[in-house]
């Protein structure tokens, strides 16, 4: 990661003032699940032994002008983390605009998931199978 001209970093306490004040253009989070319409679940899987604490993710998810996520497409069980509807508690509703994965990049729209690009060699049908049959809009 390289800080570009105009970029900034600061203490986490100051970050909440920046976030809540609407001064953050883009936030990048790591999710457990993301819905095709941009719902974000990134703080709790619902397991009984987990200590639930949403932390500042909810502030980021709704306070940034754009929320992007970066993740592996598949979870450790081989299932897509991009889902029709999140099964885990939500961090934000309809807040994710872009999904960057190890295999493809997507945009979340009101109509559903839009494919932006894939890694070289990954076919559309193979990607659809990995997504578990989730409808996929193609870029114009």
For each feature predicted by the language model, list its residue ranges.
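Conserved phosphate- and dinucleotide-binding cores of soluble alpha/beta proteins
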Residues: 1-139
